[in-house]
Amino acid sequence: MMPVYMDPSQPCQMRPQEYYYQGFGNNSQHMAMDAPPPCHGSCVHGNFPAYWPPCYPPQVPYHQCCMNRSAFHPPHASYAPSCYVHPPFPVGYQPWFDVEKDVPGKHHCGKCSSQMCDLKKDRGVVIEEHEPEIEKGEAVLPVRSTNCPYPIIWIPHENARNQEYRSSLGLGKHNQPPAEVRAPDNMTIQKSFPESWRGCFPFDESSMKSLVQNQDSKKAQNGKTVEAPFDISKFKSLLQGQDMKEAQIQKNKEELGQLTYPTSWVPSRRKRDDVEASESSNEDRKKMQNGKTVEYPFDISMIKSLIQGQDVKEAQNQKNKEEPGQVPYPIFWIPSYGKRKDVEASESKESSNEGRNLESCPSDLHRNEGQITQAKGKEGNFECNVLSDAEEKSSVINIPVANHLQEPRNIPVKLSENHLPKPTEPTKRIAKNEPVKSTKKEQSSSSSEASKLPPVCLRVDPLPKERNGGSKSVSHPKRMEKSKETKIAAPLSSKKAESRTVPEACNVKCEDANAEMKMAEGSLNALRTEKGSVESNSNLQEESNGEIIKPCEAKENREQPAKKSFTEEEAARIIQSMYRGYDVRRWEPIKKLKEIATVREQMGDVKKRIEALEASTDQHIEEKEIVVNGELVMNLLLKLDAVEGLHPSIREFRKALATELSSIQDKLDSLKNSCASAEKEAVKEQVEIKSQPSDSPVNLEHSQLTEENKMVSDTNLEKVLRLSPEEHPMSVLNRTDEKQAESAAETEEGYGLFETLATDSKQATENAAAASSTTIPEKIGEVETVVPGNPPSADGNGMTVTNVEENKAMVVESLEEPINELPQMVEETETNSIRDPENASEVSEAETNSSENENRKGEDDIVLHSEKNVELSELPVGVIDEETQPLSQDPSSSYTREGNMTAMDPKTASQEETEVDHSPNNSKGIGQQTSEPQDEKEQSPETEVIVKEQPLETEVILNEQAPEPEITEPGISKETKKLMEENQRFKETMETLVKAGREQLEVISKLTSRVKSLEKKLSHKKKTQIRRRASKPMSVSPTDAVL
């Protein structure tokens, strides 16, 4: 026969567990063997392992699963071979998964799957094996093995009571158990192994009964508890075929409230006579041994009740009554969960009785209660006048506190004479079986406690927690305070105070109710709400104060006004007014008006600051304040723009504020312009102050010469204008080729430079300042070279005088017109500086030539000057006039004049003195000879520097050099030093002014860029706001559709 683990038809390919086959004699080796797995008929585990001999003959036909009787045994089991004998039926077996579904046909072994056991069904569910969750007290046996499907059961042998067994444990004999738990006298010592070790289950019931009777399943030896490892009552129930689950449930119900720890019970007041009965009940089933509480895991009385059918509880109570003196000290008992309600009810009744007694009995009786009860106890009378429960309810009123979890407080109230209850017959109380001494002690202890504390009904409870209308308590907080005041004010010994406090509270409540009714007459809504409150208040007063508040109720009922009914028109008006109010509130006009008011206040502050700016004189501070105020105005405009959704009446206010702010902005712009003009004027004033000359004869002569030159220039302008354009080509042909080229180049450069350099004013000032210091000496030198050649030409020719006068007039005109245009022509200075040596060579040639050549040169010069003047006069007049007007006022020509004087040598000065002293013809000759260099000096860098600030006094530089030789040589040296110093100062001031102008330009450019950025932001915000407004109805529509 194939072994089990090699058979492919068997799903479990594991070896079966080893188990013991029934042997012969007193062989106890089976205690170390495991039981075999059970078989229920559907699975056959009859194949033996390979190392055992094959089963011949085949398996015995009968099987324990197929038998109906639980106590079936094979005949002559002891004489049958071990391979043919089946294991006995497991007595303590229960199904693996569920106890209630104990059907033999539906169960299979734990090692087989459900698919093999139930082949008829097409579907099979594989159940995962796991440990069942067994509640406490529902286990079949106390020990459960997870590896083996059956529990391990151990029954204590009879040798457990043996003295030797106790001595082996090392226990002495000095601690003996009490008489009621000692072992029976007929117990004998067995040296051999007990019979319970032999044979298999089931045992005889008689032997089990004797075992249970002789051994109480637990025994206290030498002051310690010996516990049995299993519950015999449960085991007995299995033998008798009872349902252990129902028995366990019944046992739990019976043992409800049984505590597993030592407890103590202090009896309540008026319940001390029941202490003895509670001691005799002994519901917790604890044994007191040598001053220690012994606790057992199972109930011995239940086993006896199952076997003998006796009520162990009654027997134990009778035994305790018969032997009352065995317990050396009293047992204190705490009532179980089910009995606590009765105790609390009794305590509440006692407290109510005390509250009623307070009305009829003085406080001295309560204080001396112990003495009175002792005296009555001696006489044997325990009688007292007690009211019934109905009378207690009528006499004592329970007022609930806001906190429902607390117990109700009992407040005594004195009733009228008509409503006092009639005294009833005294009721007898249960007398105690204890002696009078014990009662005296107990009553004395109660009297001492009563003397320390006041009665329960007059104790003041802590203030209840206030609740915001969530509680269902009927009492109002104000009324609760009034009632508390009455409680505190009431003394313990007087009745009058108690009778007065409650009516006062009633009057206060009535007055409060009347005041509320008067306030309710104001509006319709208040009337409706106050109706409910009045009704609730009346109910409150009825419940709290009983019949005393009836007159207050009558007053309230009289003062209630009739309900007002509205017509349709009145109701429509009310509804419309309410809706209009809601519609106005929806606009939020107050909030937006407040925002506009804040903007208006800030605007007033800005106005004050602007007025202060107008009054101030500091230019630097003004510029900064103007910028700050401009930003403030822009912020206020933004705030006004942010106020949206205005009512039409409010929009007008916003428009007015916006116009005021725009006017303020215009004022700030005008202040900016005025500040700029003021800066220019201040710069001019500073220059004038620094350029004022000292009072000297030289300065006076210069002033006189400037006036004369102005007059000459005015008279000679007409002559130049009368020149016809036909004379120009004739004069050009008579000139030499070199002069024609020079004149043509000069005119072309004049036009081109005027157009290209019209925008570069800054570079012109810098180059002019640099060139002025270098070019002055060269030009003065040129004048010196021209002077010595004049006398011979002047003496011999009469034509030269007229030519010289004409040349002077032409020089004046030529200096007036181009000087106005030269501030923007900086590059022309370089070309003129290159031409200076050519002019010098021409002057030297003029000295060597004869008088005839000189006359020709004079005529040619006049023609050239006329050409230049005509060409320059054709330029736009507006450009020239704009620059000449501010510059003509500058009196700084003295600096240029003095600068020219510094470069002159003392030798040239002496030569000029000699030439000027001869005759006036020399002066005319000087003018005639210097006509050409003067034409070139008009475009030189020296004239450019002077043109920017003093255009009219450049004429003086050329014509004022005649009177200078009057000064002596030592005087010239000192003045030249002063002039040099003043020239340097002038240069420094010019540089500082140029830098300041640049800084101002930068600031202006930054401000303009900032203003542009702010304008862009404003435009962008307005666009986004418009888009958001347009998108609102789109966002609302889908939600409305969904709703």
From Swiss-Prot:
Induction: By heat shock, by salicylic acid (SA), by abscisic acid (ABA), by calcium, by hydrogen peroxide, and by pathogen B.cinerea attack. Up-regulated by HSFA2. GO terms for cellular component: plasmodesma. It holds the Pfam family BAG. The keyword DNA damage does not apply. Residues 840-852 have a biased composition (Low complexity). IQ domain mediates interaction with calmodulin. This is BAG family molecular chaperone regulator 6. The lineage of its organism: Eukaryota, Viridiplantae, Streptophyta, Embryophyta, Tracheophyta. The gene is BAG6.
